[in-house]
Amino acid sequence: HKAIRRQRQMCIRDRLWPEGKVPNYDNIAKFVNAGIRGVRAVDKDVPVMLHLDNGGNNALYREWFDEFTKRGEDFQIIGLSYYPFWHGTLDMLTDNMNDIAERYGKDLIVAEVSMGYTMEDYKDYEKLSDEERKGYATKQELVEKIEYPMTVQGQYDFMEDFLNRISHIKGNRGKGFFYWEPAWIPVPGSGWATEASLKYMNDKGPCGNEWANQALFDYQGNVLPTWNLIRDFKPEE
């Protein structure tokens, strides 16, 4: 869940920064290597994925993984986050994936991806006041930069193109993706954090859902065509 993930990220930042913040790669490697060794101690056969955000930023990936591979334990998978409203074009994602697939010889997984299907407000579904709501993550100024319209068809077309792109990464290194978050529709009580999480992070609540227009179900819970696309997808030759 997003609340758990965000809480974990904040704990990591609080405890590892500034010692573990870029460009302190010696320290970063020590922290990450300790985590890898912990995984190996439990099960030496578990694949390890190192996951960065901003999947269209090749310079970021080259710098981080160049520095880590000089110092790091072995890992099997590079994970990327890619949201078209934050991380550039599909061309940028594809170019980055092809480059790092060859450069590091690792399998790749897009560990986070989504595309909106509407800009219809969902305030009435959440039943929260304006002060309590988070609102959209996809602000209008971000939507205007996307190559695809934020419509049901736009979501479908984006995901079809995305799936074909990651299916043709050099060396067959593109191994899959995780859609974030397909079933997070705007019903009352479906905010991103529990009361305990909000208290821990000193954040106001209940905050609501800022991601509902990215789901694979509409606001009433009806499945969207993109769900069937993903289920039945076969890459273009």
Residue spans for each PLM region:
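Single conserved hydrophobic/aromatic residue that forms the stacking wall/gate
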Residues: 1-12
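Active-site cradle of extracellular carbohydrate-active enzymes
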Residues: 5-6, 25-58, 64
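Active-site-proximal beta-alpha loop/turn segments in soluble metabolic enzymes
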Residues: 13-23, 47-53, 79
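Aromatic-rich peripheral "rim/lid" segments of glycoside hydrolase catalytic domains that contact
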Residues: 20-23, 95, 99-102, 118-161, ...
